[in-house]
Amino acid sequence: MAQHGRRYVRAFISGFFVAVPVTVTFLDRVACIARVEGVSMQPSLNPDARGESDIVLLNRWRARNYDVQRGDIVSLVSPKNPEQKIIKRVIALEGDIVKTLGHKNRYVKVPRGHVWVEGDHHGHSFDSNAFGPVSLGLLHSHATHILWPPNRWQKLKPFLPVERESVQND
């Protein structure tokens, strides 16, 4: 009987030592989940500021390959605070010319290897209008689905507000 118990313990330990590296690699390279805090992406994410925070599925694989399109919602390392990750919408890609918000008649050409990101809730978002174009190297992942709360479960499709379309696309 004791030998039978040891076999289960040994199987559990060996399974544990296989499962942990596989899980860590998956979360580091493929996908993970994150809770969205704040109001900067309202109404797309966290539409009710007093309610539950949205929990989103983040696809890390696409970000690693710099597979970015206008309208994608992405998670990125904050250019102002490397300890913080922020979530924003891609408005423009390299070579695009964008009219900035909050600056009269100011136009910016997005440099090579960069994107222009903004929150959906203008005036309540710390985004490219404050810190400029963002290096593709700061992208962490793409938000692909809202997982929680259950009544908000949905796929996040790329969407670009008409008023935020680029002035010129290369």
UniProtKB/Swiss-Prot annotation:
Membrane topology value: Single-pass membrane protein
Subunit text: Heterodimer of 2 subunits, IMMPL1 and IMMPL2.
UniProt main location, coarse: mitochondrion
Organism: Xenopus laevis
Protein's recorded name: Mitochondrial inner membrane protease subunit 2
Function: Catalyzes the removal of transit peptides required for the targeting of proteins from the mitochondrial matrix, across the inner membrane, into the inter-membrane space.
Keywords recorded for this protein, A-Z: Hydrolase, Membrane, Mitochondrion, Mitochondrion inner membrane, Protease, Transmembrane, Transmembrane helix
Annotated catalytic residues: 40, 88
Family: Belongs to the peptidase S26 family. IMP2 subfamily.
Cysteine pairings via disulfide bonds: none
Transmembrane annotation, as ranges: 12-31
Organism superkingdom: Eukaryota
Sample GO molecular function, one term: serine-type endopeptidase activity
E.C. numbers: 3.4.21.-
A Gene Ontology cellular-component term: mitochondrial inner membrane peptidase complex
GO BP field: protein processing involved in protein targeting to mitochondrion; signal peptide processing
Subcellular location: Mitochondrion inner membrane
Annotated gene: immp2l
